[in-house]
From Swiss-Prot:
The lineage of its organism: Bacteria, Pseudomonadati, Myxococcota, Myxococcia, Myxococcales. Belongs to the PAPS reductase family. CysD subfamily. It is an enzyme of class 2 (transferase). Its EC number is 2.7.7.4. Disulfide bonds: none annotated. The keyword Glycosyltransferase does not apply. The gene is cysD. It catalyses: sulfate + ATP + H(+) = adenosine 5'-phosphosulfate + diphosphate. This is Sulfate adenylyltransferase subunit 2. It comes from the Bacteria. The keyword Lyase does not apply.
Length: 305
C-alpha cells in the first residue's frame, strides 16, 4: 500500500468512526429518532454507516422518504429493491393537500413547489410520528449555509432553524437537550466531502442509483442546464426537442429540477477521477438552489433539511 493510499484509508476510517459515534450518541440521547432517506449517494453512505453502527441488531429507527412524486424512476426502483432486500422499515410521506391542489414544478415554480412538497411535507411527517431527532446526509462542503450549520442542528417548535441560536460543539460533545415540541436535525456526514463520499462508496462497495454513472439518456438543454426527460409529464417549451447524450448526475433530486453533466464516467473509479479534476460545485445542477439569493438558508429557516 502506497503512502497516499494509506493516508486516504486512514482518513476515511477517521470519518467513519466520527459518524458512527454521532449516530450512536443520537440514539442514546433521543427518544424517537428517524433517518431521512432521499435515495442519493449521501443517504446510501449514511445508511451503510448506521447499519455498521448497530450491527448485528436491526436499525433502532425507521427511514423516512419525503416523496414529491417527481423523483427519477430509477430512484424509486432502487429504493424499493434496496429496502426490500435488507428488510428496512421505511415510512413514505407525501403532502396530500399539495397533491390534491396539483402543485408541480412547472406551474408553481421551484420555490412554492419545494416549500409544499419538501419542507411542509417533512414537517408534517416529523409531527405526525413525533420524531425528536432526524438524521440527514448533508455535508458542509455542499453549500454556504450548510457550511456554518452544527452537527446537532437545533429546530424550534415550528421546525425552523435560526443560525443565531446554534449551540457550541466542543470536540465530540453534543448537547441534545430539547423541550417538548422542539427537535434536532443531526448530520453525521458534516465533515465529509463529495470526494470522501465517493472514496468510501468504492472502499465499502456501497450500491448507488445508476443515474450517478454515465449512459445515453434523453435530455433537453434549458438555459445551459441539461434536464432529463424521464417520463411523459416533462413539459417541453417551444423549440425544445429531446436528444440523446451521454450524461450522468452529480446530485439527484426531482427530475425537472436536476441538471445532468456530460460525462464518460461509468464506474466509481472513473467518477472519482472526474471529481478530482472538477472545478464546478456539486449542487450547480440543483435548480432549487438558485431561485433567489441565499435560497438554501431561507429554505432551512423555514424547516427544509
Amino acid at each position: 500500500m502506497s503512502e497516499h493510499t494509506f493516508a486516504r484509508a486512514s482518513h476515511l476510517s477517521e470519518l467513519e468512526a466520527e459518524s458512527i459515534h454521532i449516530l450512536r450518541e443520537t440514539v442514546a440521547e433521543f427518544a424517537n429518532p428517524v433517518m431521512l432517506y432521499s435515495i442519493g449517494k449521501d443517504s446510501q453512505v449514511l445508511l451503510h454507516l448506521a447499519r455498521k453502527a448497530f450491527h448485528p441488531a436491526p436499525l433502532p429507527f425507521p427511514l423516512l422518504h419525503v416523496d414529491t412524486t417527481w423523483k427519477f424512476r430509477d430512484m424509486y426502483a432502487f429504493r424499493d429493491a434496496f429496502v426490500a432486500r435488507h428488510g428496512l422499515r421505511l415510512i413514505i410521506h407525501r403532502n396530500q393537500r399539495a397533491l390534491a391542489e396539483g402543485i408541480n414544478p412547472f406551474d408553481h415554480g421551484s420555490q412554492k413547489y419545494t416549500h409544499a412538497m419538501k419542507t411542509q411535507a417533512l414537517l408534517e411527517a416529523l409531527a405526525a410520528h413525533g420524531f425528536d431527532a432526524a438524521f440527514g446526509g448533508a455535508r458542509r462542503d455542499e453549500e454556504k449555509s450548510r457550511a456554518k450549520e452544527r452537527v446537532f442542528s437545533f429546530r424550534d417548535r415550528h421546525g425552523q432553524w435560526d443560525p443565531r441560536r446554534q449551540r457550541p460543539e466542543l470536540w465530540n460533545l453534543f448537547n441534545g437537550r430539547v423541550d417538548a415540541g422542539e427537535s434536532m436535525r443531526v448530520f453525521p456526514l458534516s465533515n465529509w466531502t463529495e470526494l470522501d463520499v465517493w472514496h468510501y462508496v468504492l472502499r465499502e462497495r456501497i450500491p448507488v442509483v445508476p443515474l450517478y454513472f454515465a449512459a445515453e439518456r434523453p435530455v433537453i438543454d434549458r438555459g445551459g442546464t441539461l434536464l432529463m426527460v424521464d417520463d411523459e409529464r416533462m413539459r417541453l417549451r417551444p423549440g425544445e426537442k429531446p436528444e440523446i447524450r451521454r450524461v450522468r448526475f452529480r446530485t439527484l433530486g426531482c427530475y425537472p429540477l436536476s441538471g445532468a453533466i456530460e460525462s464518460s464516467a461509468t464506474t466509481v473509479e472513473t467518477v472519482i477521477h472526474e471529481m478530482v479534476n472538477a472545478r464546478q460545485s456539486e449542487r450547480q445542477g440543483r435548480l432549487i438552489d438558485h431561485d433567489e439569493e441565499g435560497s438554501m438558508e431561507l429554505k432551512k429557516r423555514e424547516g427544509y433539511f
